[in-house]
């Protein structure tokens, strides 16, 4: 699959009719199957928008570095898109995050900077 094809797949996910919810409400209700995105998350869309917007506005150029603090799917979405566009990715991630999540990020080429977990209001959340 070409890089262009992968990019085009982001957000191009099917709608699935939710039968029981539709029957209960007497209207058609659909769910968007975002797990069909390349990174298997709705966050692929956000990552694509952020990176393409940064390119368009000349905030980043080929070979640039993206740094993101995340414990979740945003990092995986950024990993998918950054790899395609040729950017390096550094993810600041809590040490407590699952091994599987860390392995997925590394497989996408991300460098992980592991930090102690801290609440968002704690200044330690922003420093190593």
Question: Where would I find each of the regions flagged by the language model?
Answer:
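PLP-dependent amino-acid enzyme catalytic core
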Residues: 1-128
